[in-house]
UniProtKB/Swiss-Prot annotation:
Keywords: Nucleus, Repeat, Ribosome biogenesis, rRNA processing, WD repeat
Family to which the UniProt record says this protein belongs: Belongs to the WD repeat BOP1/ERB1 family.
GO terms of molecular function: ribonucleoprotein complex binding
Keyword rRNA processing: yes
Region ranges (Disordered): 1-56
Low complexity composition bias: residue spans: 12-24, 33-50
Pfam families to which the protein is assigned, alphabetical: BOP1NT (PF08145), WD40 (PF00400)
Cell compartments where the protein resides: Nucleus, Nucleolus; Nucleus, Nucleoplasm
Keyword Signal: no
Species of the source: Leishmania infantum
Family matches, as PROSITE patterns: WD_REPEATS_2, WD_REPEATS_REGION
Protein name from the UniProt record: Ribosome biogenesis protein BOP1 homolog
WD repeats: 430-469, 640-680, 682-720, 724-766, 777-808
GO cellular component: nucleoplasm; PeBoW complex; preribosome, large subunit precursor
């Protein structure tokens, strides 16, 4: 059996039940009923599960000795009444039959409740309004709740060694049961199927037969007492059934046709249903119509005036007439002197025809408003006004109201796109003029800067230490490391020449020797290059340099392989010049002399080819010059090209060359020797160009503060055109490892560097995702930006000679 608090009780023998009854107040019956019969005809129903009648309330329970079967009802004090003659009525068999057992305990309890055994003397009746004193009992169920944790989730104690606290605050420890003990209990205990677990007290309790009977009745929506008859109160003479007078018994009953609707009735009902559904759908489409009908209506509202369609259209679709312009200063009766016409102007006005005159009068000055004469052109002006109103075009244009916030794309939070450069970490000092270019070595260990103070400086990235300075003798336009890790070359554009430097401290000796032979000995085979690695070298003050024996061998090899038939042609384009002894001591190996100032240049990904731009060369086809360093070849690929070039780049994976002009970007196929595509750069003059490492996208900056993202698979026009700066975009660059860091940066003359997250997907159904993530601010215009090859670090240079490193 389960107590009212959900606490299961162990199985035990059924206690002797007792009856607490409330004898109803009897009423005399007028139709031959005796007083004794009316007193015994009381009705008793369960107070917990059935509705009591107006004249009878009976509660049948158990005595205090067996209060463990009515644990929840012992604490109810003002519930039960007793009449004085209850004992007399208990002898009546009718009264005993009407008693109801709330919680039957098998057949024994039912018989005891009905008074069959004659144990009614053991019952105890309490009057309503008195306190029922509980008697002492040794039953375990009569004990109060041991666990005093209250109404809280018991899951809070699942990780503890106790289940709660008793009334004295002591812990109630858990009972540890092994898996074997639980298995034995489940197999050996005959009452395992009727045993439940009390989680509040950490113990098992067995359900009695009465508990199972109660659960069975509740599951089937029955009364708790199986012996209760809800129709015991009904008198036999109150309900009389005569089969012959029943409607179904007369004339054989109704036919089946009476219950089947007629066909025409079904059609009418279906039509009504369709009309109701249609009205419901229209009501959903116009949710505000019913609300307007419920509101108070204006008495003189034009919306309730009945009018035809034409009048309704003219009334509700009228276009307001255009207003007259306000009078100007020249129409004043006392205008300023500068508005008064001269005699020459009056004569010119008089010579014009009336149709050619802008105004029909000339400004005049009067001392007072009353001196102003009548305007002779009043009627003509009114007539012209009427013509304008009658013939001016009336047109209605639907204005589309769009929320600007809905037009913006949904972008992710920049915090979720980390890492990207956020804070200033390093200052590389020592520059005294504008730093126009920065470049990072392929291994990310060294940083080279080109400055207007004629010096090329190489710093160590991690420490900021100045490793080497190279005096170029003129302002340096650009510096760049060779992207190939097998070559240690630092190239610099200095006015009319390209200078190739070998910073010996930046690579191993074998790499340095291989680089020198790569630049000085064209035509050597791979075996000869490997054999050349074994030649000796000495250290000088200017760095590590090759011996004179090595130089002589290189010069002999160069003279033996020189193309004598192409000397004049080479002189027209560019010329390779070997460095002097002093320059070789400083690390300078080769110079390339140009006919005009070199503005920009770029390396191929393998380091053998190089393209230089000389936009101010008077010979148009020499503006773009390509060089092959290993063979010292010079050629101009664009013979009939006449546009001014601004920047150039090699495709990182394919033999494609990008050339940026003032208003377009040309894409050339170097294998087919033809123009492959042309991209239109809308806006101002292009200033810089950067190719995505995957090769399918590129960026273009211009003088109108715009950065254009081009997708080669999308269109010839920009996929995105971003205006984030307020000055000329001077530099932009993609991160070399976009798979790990999908970033690119733009620097402009407004002193800001904008960092973007630019994700390119392999799926052609997804467009590139461009999200601005950070703005890095400087005091002066930014001229160059460069990314670290393996980290999310950004290097910038400004007009005032500040070179900084921004890290994560």
């Amino acid at each position: 059996m389960t107590s009212p608090k959900g606490k299961p009780s162990p199985k035990r023998s059924a206690p002797a039940p007792t009856t607490a009854a409330l004898t109803p107040r009897t009423e005399e019956r007028t139709e031959g009923a005796t007083s004794s019969a009316s007193a015994s005809a009381s009705s008793h129903i369960s107070s917990s599960f059935d509705s009591p009648r107006d004249d009878t309330v009976v509660f049948t329970g158990y005595t205090a000795e067996s209060k463990h079967n009515a644990h929840g009802y012992e604490r109810l004090h003002d519930i039960i009444l007793q009449d004085g003659d209850t004992g007399a009525d208990s002898e009546d068999g009718r009264a005993n039959e009407d008693n109801v057992i709330l919680f039957p305990h098998a057949e024994e309890l039912a018989n005891a409740a009905a008074g069959i055994n004659g144990d009614d003397d053991n019952g105890r009746v309490v009057r309503l309004g008195t306190i029922q004193h509980l008697e002492e009992s040794d039953s375990s169920e009569d004990e109060p709740t041991l666990n005093r944790v209250g109404d809280i989730p018991l899951e809070w104690y699942k990780d503890e060694d106790h289940i709660g606290y008793d009334i004295e605050g002591k812990k109630l420890m858990k009972k540890e049961r092994s898996a074997l003990e639980r298995l034995l209990e489940a197999t050996d205990d005959p009452n395992a199927m009727r045993t439940i677990y009390d989680a509040l007290h950490d113990e098992k309790k067995t359900l009695s037969n009465a508990d199972l009977q109660l659960i069975f009745n509740l599951q089937r929506n029955r009364t708790t007492n199986p012996n209760y008859d809800m129709y015991s109160e009904v008198q036999e003479d109150t309900v009389v059934f005569d089969p012959l007078n029943h409607p179904l018994a007369r004339s054989g009953g109704p036919s089946k046709r009476a219950f089947v609707p007629a066909l025409h009735d079904m059609k009418v009902i279906a039509k009504m249903v369709r009309r109701l559904r249609k009205e419901e759908a229209e009501r959903k489409l116009r949710p505000g119509k019913e609300e307007k009908e419920e509101e108070d209506q204006l008495l003189w509202d034009d919306g309730h005036v009945e009018m035809d369609t034409h009048t309704h259209f003219k009334y509700f679709n009228r276009v307001p007439k255009p207003k007259l312009p306000p009078p100007g200063t020249f129409e004043s009766y006392r205008p300023p002197p500068e508005y008064l016409p001269s005699e020459r102007a009056k004569q010119r006005q008089a010579r014009l025809r009336a149709i050619d005159r802008k105004e029909h009068f000339l400004p005049q000055s009067f001392d007072a408003l009353r001196h102003v004469p009548f305007y002779h052109h009043t009627i003509q002006d009114r007539y012209q006004r009427c013509l304008d109103l009658a013939f001016f075009p009336r047109a209605q244009r639907t204005r589309l109201v769009v929320d600007p916030d809905k037009l913006l794309p949904e972008l992710p939070d920049p915090k979720d796109l980390r890492p990207y450069p956020e804070k200033l970490s390093f200052h590389y000092k020592g520059h005294t003029a504008t730093v126009r270019s920065v470049s990072v070595s392929p291994n990310g260990q060294y940083l080279a800067t080109g400055c207007d103070d004629h010096l090329v400086r190489v710093f160590e990235v991690q420490t900021g230490r100045l490793m080497k300075r190279y005096d170029m003798g003129a302002p340096v336009q650009q510096v760049e490391f060779c992207p190939s890790t097998s070559l240690n070359i630092l190239a610099a554009a200095v006015e009319y020449s390209l200078v190739f430097i070998v910073p010996t401290f930046a690579a191993h000796t074998l790499v340095n020797d291989h680089t020198i032979r790569f630049l000085r000995a064209p035509g050597l085979s791979a075996g000869q290059r490997e054999a050349a690695h074994a030649l000796g070298a000495v250290d000088t003050l200017g760095g590590r340099a090759v011996t004179q024996t090595t130089l002589d061998a290189d010069e002999t090899a160069h003279e033996a392989t020189a193309d004598l038939h192409d000397i004049e042609e080479r002189e027209k384009r560019a010329e390779f010049v070997d460095a002097s002894a002093k320059e070789r001591n400083a690390g300078i190996v080769v110079k390339i002399a140009m006919h005009a100032k070199v503005k920009k240049f770029c390396f191929h990904i393998k380091g053998d080819y190089l393209c230089a731009l000389c936009p101010k060369d008077h010979v148009k086809y020499r503006q773009t010059i390509m060089l092959q360093l290993s063979k010292r070849k010079v050629f101009c690929p664009f013979r009939k090209f006449s546009e001014v070039v601004t920047d150039c780049r090699f495709h990182p994976r394919e033999p494609i060359f990008f050339l940026a002009t003032t208003n377009s970007v040309r894409c050339y196929n170097l294998m087919a020797h033809r123009l492959q595509r042309r991209f239109k750069a809308s806006g101002g003059v292009t200033t810089c160009l950067s190719i995505h490492p995957e090769g399918d996208n590129f960026l273009v900056g211009d003088t109108t503060s715009h950065t254009s993202w081009f997708d080669m698979d999308f269109s010839d026009k920009p996929y995105k055109r971003m205006r984030s700066h307020r000055g000329v975009v001077n530099a932009l660059a993609f991160h070399p490892k976009t798979n790990a860091y999908p970033l690119f940066a733009t620097g402009a003359s407004d002193g800001q560097v904008h960092v973007f997250h630019g994700m390119v997907y392999d799926d052609y159904n997804k467009n590139a995702l461009v999200v601005p993530v950070k703005i890095l601010k400087h005091q002066r215009p930014v001229y160059a930006v460069a990314w670290h090859p393996t980290l999310a670090w950004l290097f910038t240079s400004t007009e005032d000679g500040v070179v900084t490193a921004w890290t994560e």
